[in-house]
């Protein structure tokens, strides 16, 4: 029986260009990996959709086009490429280095007041702009 969650192995080379470095995270729709783009010598993120989501070619292409159009929004990674690999729709996105809010809270404890506003405000402003474009984000995580 085949797995519904697609996974790439560390050091696996995708499309003769992208080397998988680590899994960044996994949500209900996809798993995201940090990878090295050996053509441009830059780190990128690869979003690989899970099979159980039933992501069709049209849906995956639509998400890639939406992500490509969000390059001007603070805190939002833009799409650089889209392809199918091992029957898996994949989006290559900007890699944004940093700590998740979840990990920050684990390490430093609860974030209070003004500090939380400073962290969240740019993301909420970008989310508002995304909604104004008619896009509903399905999987927001900390």
Enumerate the predicted regions with their spans.
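AlphaC helix of the eukaryotic protein kinase fold
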Residues: 50-70
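Flexible N-lobe loop architecture of eukaryotic-like protein kinase catalytic domains
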Residues: 25, 62, 71-75
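Conserved short submotifs of the Hanks-type protein kinase catalytic core
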Residues: 86-100, 104
């Amino acid at each position: 029986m085949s797995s519904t969650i697609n996974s790439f192995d560390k050091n696996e080379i995708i499309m003769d260009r992208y080397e998988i470095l680590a899994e960044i995270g996994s949500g209900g729709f996809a798993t995201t990996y940090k990878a090295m783009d050996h053509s441009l010598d830059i780190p990128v993120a690869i979003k690989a959709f899970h099979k159980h989501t039933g992501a069709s070619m049209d849906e995956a292409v639509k998400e890639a086009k939406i992500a490509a159009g969000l390059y001007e929004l603070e805190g939002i990674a833009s799409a650089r490429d889209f392809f199918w690999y091992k029957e898996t729709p994949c989006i290559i996105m900007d890699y944004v280095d940093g700590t998740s809010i979840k990990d920050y809270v684990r390490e430093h404890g609860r974030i209070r007041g003004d500090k939380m506003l400073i962290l969240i405000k740019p993301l909420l402003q970008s989310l508002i702009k995304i909604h104004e474009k008619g896009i509903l984000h399905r999987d927001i995580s900390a």
